[in-house]
Amino acid sequence: MWLMDNRKLINDFLDNYWLSVGVSQNTLNAYRSDLIIFDNYLKQNTDKDFKSLSKINIENYFNKRVNIDMSMSTQARIMSCFRKFFQYLLDENYIKENPIVNFKLPKKDKKLPVHLNEQEVTNLLEAPDISTTIGLRDKAMLELLYSCGLRVTELINIKLNQVNVYNEFIMVSGKGNKERMLPLSNSAMETLQKYEKEVRPNLLNQGKTNAYFLSNRGKAMSRQNFWYIIKRYANNIGINKPLSPHTLRHAFATHLVQRGADLRAVQLLLGHSDISTTQIYTYIHNTILKSQHEKHHPRG
């Protein structure tokens, strides 16, 4: 009964949230996972269900989650999910008080994202064998990802009508369906021209899809497939850093800041709604400068 009741509340909340806000499927999947994991934790560690929680139960949960090295961004997402979920329970009269009101996340040191230096990025972009159909496709995807600092979801969701390889710009749809126009680097533009002319028609064969990047079977490329592609090439060239699907996006922003780009311009290119999100790349830049100073200064 407990499990069914809690899972029904989760499903009802997600249905309501989707209908009222219209968020992406990725966000809904993440929220569902966050709430199910929390539900399992409650079942294993307490005698509480969602309707009888106190603030201390949530504090204990977050303290335990922090101890398993959860990233700040993941913590923030879970907190956002919990705030919306418990407000929904309050609005629907399932609970009388919101246990998460005025709750603050446990403090944790800021963790800078892993980034690749310019030579490592060059090596990664040159790893695909462009004499092959698949290699040229992979090269085009990697070039575009780094050229524009795209999120992987933005990359794989690009449609044919969003790319004009002769206009030197692409249109992408980011979080909240916000569109932004992004300039293409010369190398990305040249590779995309070859991909459109020589590769995509072969991958499409007799199929029909307006997805720009296609899998080996002529279907739209998936996040999982592209993540596998990145890891495979990184392993092939000996990059041993812990990578993520956002690694080239981080490299894009870090290298722009290192070369003197205005932070607000970087914010617009990345599609960040708040410049405080972009400021992490100034910290990375300063960390690199400090490391170089300590390494090369005679009294460092």
Where are these regions (language model features)?
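Conserved catalytic core of the tyrosine transesterase superfamily
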Residues: M1-G300
